[in-house]
Amino acid sequence: MKDLFILSGPTAVGKTEISLNLAKALRGEVISSDSMQIYKHMDIGSAKIFEEERQGIPHHLIDVVEPWENFSVAEYKNIAENKIEEIYNRDNIPMLVGGTGLYINSIIYNYSFTDANKDNDYRDYLEKLAKEKGKEYIHSLLKDIDEYSYNNLHYNNLKRVIRALEVYKVTGKPMSQYAKEEKENLFNIPYSIYYFVLYMDRDKLYDKINMRVDRMLQEGLLDEVKELKEMGCNETMQSMQGIGYKELLYYLNGEISFNEAVYLIKKGSRNYAKRQLTWFRRDPRAIWINKDEFENDDAIVKEILNKFNKLKGF
């Protein structure tokens, strides 16, 4: 299997510079795994790496869609997998770099984003039948086809009951068997994974986050949000849900003060970092790198390369 390198970690931990040095050493090409860097015109708030800062390292999945367009995980997976193959064809190593865990997982887990196991018409029929005959009747339909779900799902949990019936109709398998097979195939991917997660002392990280927000504001984040608003972007759009954008939009709309917006951006960023770390801990393949244990980024790069080579048996 071909190598797939991942460098992740919470927001503001310092992934970018390390990723560039790793890419030079590995002949790597970076595929952004950041759900905000996907959007054009959203540069400062997403901490986007500009062309002149990339040191000749190819970067992909940055500036893909307009801020008023939606972009799904399934779309990310499709584009990223195509980029991975293109990078292999150039005899380089693809490197997923970013902090959006769902984007990373779409590549390193055998997730299906197709509708192959769905039947909307049948689901609609069951929902209508539930209104006519009651939840208990719908639940009773499970008894002969999926005894496990029948015994473990309460009839009030209508959504799960209907899902179990739908899975059986489409796949011919009880939900429990289908879920078991899905779980067994979860790690069945065509890559050898080298997954590194950067972290540091929480208080230090939170200080870095606060300073980063201040720096973004100094660099013109408010003007960036003003320009997006002038383009027609509003709070209903997926892109404008990003931390830093939604709060400043509230400010520009007169809903909160500027100081309140800054406070909420910092608080939201810290909470996001906490959620990211929780997410990364779920993957047993992740190798954790404590930045506090190293003198500088060069030492961190050296440590990651040593671990990478050991895993490859060099």
Curated annotation (Swiss-Prot):
Site label Interaction with substrate tRNA, positions: T100, R123
Residues involved in substrate binding: T11, A12, V13, G14, K15, T16
Region listing for Interaction with substrate tRNA, in residue ranges: 34-37
Keyword Acyltransferase: no
Reactions catalysed, as given in the entry: adenosine(37) in tRNA + dimethylallyl diphosphate = N(6)-dimethylallyladenosine(37) in tRNA + diphosphate
EC number(s) from the headed UniProt entry: 2.5.1.75
UniProt xrefs under Pfam families: IPPT
Binding site for ATP: G9, P10, T11, A12, V13, G14, K15, T16
GO molecular function: ATP binding; tRNA dimethylallyltransferase activity
Alphabetized SUPFAM superfamilies for the sequence: P-loop containing nucleoside triphosphate hydrolases (SSF52540)
GO biological process, one term: tRNA modification
Cofactor: Mg(2+)
Keyword set, alphabetical order: ATP-binding, Magnesium, Nucleotide-binding, Transferase, tRNA processing
This protein's record includes keyword ATP-binding: yes
Quaternary organization: Monomer.
Protein family membership: Belongs to the IPP transferase family.
Function summary: Catalyzes the transfer of a dimethylallyl group onto the adenine at position 37 in tRNAs that read codons beginning with uridine, leading to the formation of N6-(dimethylallyl)adenosine (i(6)A).
Record protein name field: tRNA dimethylallyltransferase
Upper lineage: Bacteria, Bacillati, Bacillota, Clostridia, Eubacteriales
Gene behind this protein: miaA
